[in-house]
Amino acid sequence: MSCYDLCPPTSCISRPQPIADSGNEPCVRQCPDSTTVIQPPPVVVTFPGPILSSFPQDSVVGSSGAPIFGGSSLGYGGSSLGYGGLYGYGGSSLGYGGLYGYGGSSLGYGGLYGYGGSSLGYGGLYGYGRSYGSGYCSPYSYRYNRYRRGSCGPC
């Protein structure tokens, strides 16, 4: 690589020697251009793979026939946290009997139309027990009917 000066040449003119040496002229040196090849480093690009999902579903197939002894409406077991069926012989909705059956319904111990307590009580609303209380009769039951047989006490 060769360089050349861009500084002004010294002239052959005689001049007096200065007392202080100072100069205010820039001197620039320019060299020829150089070239180089820069290759980028290899780049690794990762494409995410597909997401495979599965949603297995289980099915239980029953048969028609006699009711089972478990929790369901029309059964003999507990339904909705209870111990009987909606139309059966056990509790429904936190109770111990069926809504139309022989046990408690809705926090009670009998059926709404049956033989036990309904709705916080111990008997049925239209049956042989009591509704909305802790007694043993209801306004429409066989033990308390002020329209037919008198009263067995306030329900």
UniProtKB/Swiss-Prot annotation:
One of its GO terms (molecular function) is structural constituent of cytoskeleton. InterPro entries: Keratin. GO terms for cellular component: intermediate filament. Sequence repeats lie at residues 70-76, 77-89, 90-102, 103-115, 116-128. It comes from the Eukaryota. Keywords: Keratin, Repeat. Pfam families: Keratin (PF02422). The avian keratins (F-ker, S-ker, C-ker and B-ker) are a complex mixture of very similar polypeptides. Belongs to the avian keratin family. This is Scale keratin. It comes from Gallus gallus.
